[in-house]
């Protein structure tokens, strides 16, 4: 397949492209792209390593979405060990995904979100989001997950993947 990316950055050569590489990577035509990950569905050993879960579910710590029956998990390492339902986890979860341990149910926004549920954001949630200083272009029935944080602030998390723990 080729070589993976080290250090979370990919380097590519394009002689027609202006040099924007970092000072340590100066080379004519070098393009440095940060935040690159290498994902595969090849059946390698790492793909079957269980993610060690240690946190217990607490309704106070894991808010539920306003428009989908799932809890929000802000950090992959904080996936609760004892929660049987659907969970919205960050996209960085894919780096730790074990198909023997978790089922990917769907995506938390856009057209793939509509495959999960026809229910978008409520008008009340949208109003609360903008009152709290939220930005962006959302409206009633927007196909994206939203929740109220522990302070009651309407929040739209960055892209979420909906998962379920297969072992519970």
Describe each PLM feature range.
Residues 1-168:
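Class I S-adenosyl-L-methionine-dependent methyltransferase catalytic core
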């Amino acid at each position: 397949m080729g070589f993976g990316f080290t250090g979370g950055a990919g380097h590519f050569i394009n002689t027609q492209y202006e040099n924007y590489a970092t000072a340590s990577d100066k080379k004519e035509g070098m393009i440095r792209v940060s935040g690159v990950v290498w994902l595969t569905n090849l059946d390698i050993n790492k793909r079957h390593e269980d993610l060690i879960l240690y946190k217990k579910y607490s309704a106070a710590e894991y808010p539920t979405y306003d428009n989908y029956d799932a809890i929000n998990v802000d950090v992959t390492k904080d996936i609760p060990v004892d929660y049987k339902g659907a969970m919205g986890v960050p996209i960085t979860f894919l780096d730790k995904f074990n198909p023997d341990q978790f089922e990917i149910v769907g995506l938390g926004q856009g057209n793939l979100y509509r495959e999960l549920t026809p229910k978008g954001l409520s008008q009340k949630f949208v109003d609360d989001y903008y009152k709290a200083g939220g930005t962006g272009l959302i409206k009633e029935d927007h196909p994206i997950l939203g929740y109220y944080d522990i302070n009651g602030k309407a929040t739209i998390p960055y892209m979420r993947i909906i998962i379920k723990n297969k072992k519970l």
